[in-house]
Regions:
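Acidic/His- and Gly-rich active-site-bordering loop/insert found
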Residues: 1-50, 71-79
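Fold-independent oxyanion-binding glycine-rich loops
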Residues: 2-3, 22-24, 44, 52, ...
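Short hydrophobic/aromatic beta-strand micro-patches
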Residues: 10, 86, 171-173
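Short glycine-biased active-site loop of nucleotidyltransferases that positions the nucleotide triphosphate
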Residues: 10-12, 99, 120-123, 160-162
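Short glycine/proline-enriched coil/turn segments at helix->beta-strand junctions
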Residues: 12-16, 104-106, 173-175
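Acidic/histidine-rich catalytic neighborhood of metal-dependent amide-processing enzymes
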Residues: 55-136
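Acidic-enriched catalytic cores of C-N bond-cleaving enzymes acting on peptides and small amides
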Residues: 122-124, 128-176
Length: 176
């Protein structure tokens, strides 16, 4: 345990290490749930619950894969496998920063089983930006330019979520 930031589970004792990086924190549940979001509900052969896809399902799958490899003697003697589970992936990766600073050693190769099966081969990315539009206040026609202000804007429950909806209210005045 790394002070609640992360934990690790290792099988094998080889010098070479393969890492599996996963996380167990989740973003807010948001609206639209047909089942309790923080309970695992099995419905029509699927598990529903906040974080079952991102990333608790992959954590459990990784544990089963590690057990299968060990039980079937598939891990070469020179290799070990380490599952690193973080608790702060959704809000800034402090878990990985802490782990990097305190772990005795890092894996030689790693992969992240985050998201849809069988594979996600890209990251959506994250960007913060300011949006502005010149209404002509600094031009020769400044007297005729409308005045506008965003009075309210809300989209999503967190900055790292794709929102289900966005709401923007504006105040615009212009002479007619």
């Amino acid at each position: 345990n790394y002070n609640g930031y992360a934990t690790e589970i290792t099988v094998g004792s080889g010098e070479k290490m393969a890492g599996i990086l996963a996380h167990v924190d989740v973003v807010e549940a948001g609206p639209g749930w047909e089942t309790p979001p923080f309970q695992a509900v099995i419905k029509d052969g699927r598990i529903y619950g906040r974080g079952s896809l991102d990333d608790k399902g992959p954590v459990v799958s990784s544990l089963y894969a590690m057990k299968y490899i060990v039980d079937n003697d598939l891990l070469p003697d020179e290799w070990s496998i380490r599952l690193i589970v973080g608790a702060d992936e959704e809000e800034g990766l402090r878990c990985i920063d802490y782990y990097n600073e305190h772990a005795e050693r890092m894996p030689d190769v790693s992969f992240v089983p985050d998201g849809y099966f069988p594979m996600v081969n890209c990251e959506k990315g994250l960007v913060d930006f300011d949006l502005s539009y010149d209404l002509g206040k600094n031009s020769d026609d400044a007297d005729d330019a409308p005045e506008a202000a965003i009075t309210y804007f809300k989209a999503g429950l967190g900055r790292n979520m794709v929102p289900a909806e966005a709401v923007c209210e504006m105040s615009v005045t212009a002479e007619v």
